[in-house]
Amino acid sequence: MPHNFGDFRATGTVYLVGAGPGDPELLTLKALRLVRAADAIVYDQLVSPQILAFARTGAQTIFVGKKPGAFCCPQRDIEGTLLRLAREGKTVVRLKGGDPFVFGRGGEEAEALAAAGIAFEIVPGVTSALGAASYTGIPLTHREHSSAVVFLTGHEDPKKTDSSFRWEDYGRLDATLCIYMGMKNLESITRRLQAGGLASDTPAAVIQSATTGAHRQFVGTVGDIALASERAGFGAPAIVIVGNVVRLASKLAWFEANRAHALPS
Ligand code: SAH
């Protein structure tokens, strides 16, 4: 029991919240309620400013994202920030792009909170592969084309050895592949998928800044997508989708079509 009741303040709760892929309307009602109520919001660079604008006046907003090419915040510091804010009795929202448990290091942050005995909740978000697929008109499964979906990262923890990730095996899966953080290594990834047996004419798409005003999509084949998308100026943040379902984008690409027909504002 604290010896001085005047100093006592209950520890706050940390909410690990998915902000979705970009379009603020893809935020869940629960995420919106928590963002509005938070005393402190600790956010990444992929969180849209329109979502941060929902924070209440006076809420503390703390950026912990990594700027491209620069190193901002070691994971241990981010975890330390969450613990400190909670111990100050604050309601903390840790806002992450997409879903906190899909390549978002939400697991590590939840582990740190659990180890420190801080109360936490996880609020799922629309992960960017789902946002990219829907807005590009690529059904990730389809009774005629694909019965399985895999989420993969093209950029592993540098501490892991190369052999721990066998792209050749994924080339044999006959599944839709959704590759996060794949742009830098796309040439080698697509080469290794083909070495595993994936036909070079399998359709592939790169979707950059999916669901946002800057959304761009590029469709090619596994054989040519790396070079062709680079030549077309595509880069991170982008999702690469590989599989026969990508063919449907030529019929179902509603988002680009609607934008093309929209009157200039
Ligand atoms: N937790 C996030 C993923 C974070 S890793 C999620 O669930 O989506 C960061 C990677 O996510 C980026 O390199 C990119 O591959 C992908 N990404 C995030 N937002 C994106 C967007 N709007 N469009 C395309 N890819 C996106």
Kindly give the residue locations of the regions a language model identified.
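Short hydrophobic/aromatic-enriched beta-strand-loop microsegments
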Residues: 59-66, 117-121, 140-150, 197-206
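Class I SAM-dependent methyltransferase SAM-binding "motif I" and its flanking Rossmann-like core
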Residues: 3-4, 97-173, 216-219
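Class I S-adenosyl-L-methionine
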Residues: 1-24, 29-126, 226
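A contiguous loop/helix-start segment that scaffolds small-molecule binding in enzyme catalytic cores
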Residues: 2-5, 11-14, 88-92, 148, ...
